[in-house]
Amino acid sequence: KEWHVPVSIGIIWFLWHYHYFYQNGIEVPLLSFFIGCIAESFVYEYLLQWSEGNLLSSMTYHFSWNLCIHLFAINPADNAGNEFPYILMTLFEVSMVLLLLAHDKSRHMHKLPTK
């Protein structure tokens, strides 16, 4: 599995949102946001592969993620500046990526050899 593709997309995605930090549009920790962009890129890649290239799965995940950030007051702008929920959510997502990568590695290890 190529790890550099989701990492590159995560960096580009982070740079795409970077200007919001200077416009006071994003009040989350910069490092956590950067790590989150890369972690989410791995999830999107997994969803795209799982759904055989259907973008709807990734779009639904992105929508759900953004909805949860505001619905459950994870965004520091929604909870009096507390950054802990956002950092915790980022750690959860990194854990999910590690599980997906372990599952993917395990799945490839159990394939029968072909002639």
Regions inferred by a protein language model and the residue ranges of each:
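Membrane-water interface at transmembrane helix exits
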Residues: 16, 20, 48-52, 65
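C-terminal membrane module of polytopic membrane proteins
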Residues: 56, 60-115
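Hydrophobic alpha-helical segments embedded in the membrane of multi-pass proteins
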Residues: 34-46
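Membrane-interface helix caps and helix-loop-helix hairpins in membrane proteins
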Residues: 21-28, 76-82
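Membrane-helix boundary elements
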Residues: 3-25
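Generic alpha-helical transmembrane segments of integral inner-membrane proteins
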Residues: 11, 15, 38-39, 95
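Membrane-interface helix/loop boundary segments of multi-pass membrane proteins
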Residues: 1-8, 46-54
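A loop-to-helix transmembrane entry motif
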Residues: 6, 24-37
